[in-house]
């Protein structure tokens, strides 16, 4: 249950990060948005792998 909540929260954060990236103009903020997106994407992939492993072991 906790894992599913983490996945949902991370997906929401990823959606917000994409929205922020599309709206920034300043080059420094663009770089910052890219790093944020990459970080959240890595966490999202990690959580999805964990869910997959948990499902396989059930």
Language-model segments: what does each one mean?
Residues 1-58:
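Charge-rich amphipathic alpha-helical interaction elements
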